[in-house]
Amino acid sequence: MGLAVTQNGLARATSSLSLNRSIMLMAQDVYREPDDTIIVGNDTDGYTFALERGGELVLGSNSVTEVLPDDSDDTAPDSQVQKPSVIALEGETIVLQSDSRVTVTGGDISIEASTNPRLQGSFGGLGDPDASPAEVIVESGAIIDASGDDTTVVSVARNYVQVEARGNELADSPLQRDGAIRDETLVVDIREGTEFLNIEGAVASIERDVHERLSPGGTITIQSVGRVSIEEGATLDISGGSVTYSGDQVAPSQLVTADGQVLDMADADPNLVYSGVFGDFAFDHEKWGITETFLPALSYYEAGYIEGRDAGILEINAPGIVFEGNLIADTTAGIHQRMAPEDLAAGQFNALTRSYN
């Protein structure tokens, strides 16, 4: 922190499952002046210390400022919240020179230009852009990147969870609580789901590494009490990342109804009577004097595929905005997502200004 800050090198941090990281570059000045009223800080001999001047922050050409996921193989369930990592740039004038790069994988990038750091909450789009010298300039060739991670590779078999059909799992299927399926271990495809039993606990226990947890696109927020200028050739990237599923052998469960139908778990009606789980059991038809034998369930090879993640958000808030750069908000629609495109969110671009050029 200082009234003039220049970053010409490499500033890097890494995110983990348990810790998000931040890089904060602030061009601000701490000074004192006589004042009988304490605004912030401690009163020392009639003076008040406060951050009241924004300065000049420059990210030099070819500089790199980045927060990346670490290379750990550690995993955690979705119940463990993954806080986004942050890069914050603050000053009165903020310049990202040509070929500079700011990157937070699937995280938040905040750029705020203000003459007075104490009044940062006053950003608004209805003022006069010429009334303040505050400005954010992103030069041609500069890159601001909050895109999601696309390096995760897991087995397609992870989509199949084992669930024991017991009290909690059959809470919404009263007909099955004392039926032939109770206490059986069932394998369910979480992409298709099932109404037969509750699989939420099994799904919540699926563990993911930090790369997968950072695969959705992040957020880029640029605010100024004066102007924001994104020059032609500058790039802002909020693309969604992806997860690659490798092919594997899978063996989802099937249920056999009392009249001999074999149903996939996605089609299993909890209001039907079942004889058992398809695979290596015999069912005696006493009325007809015959025994029907079901062979073990066969596994099969499921091919791999890519699953895209949501793109992120770009928000620009200033009285004067010139956006001539490139906005990238790509998403990858995998084979399963092409059948349900509403499950993949596109990027958002929100601009609040008096006049948009």
PLM features: what roles do these ranges have?
Residues 1-357:
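Extracellular and secretory-pathway beta-repeat/beta-biased strand scaffolds
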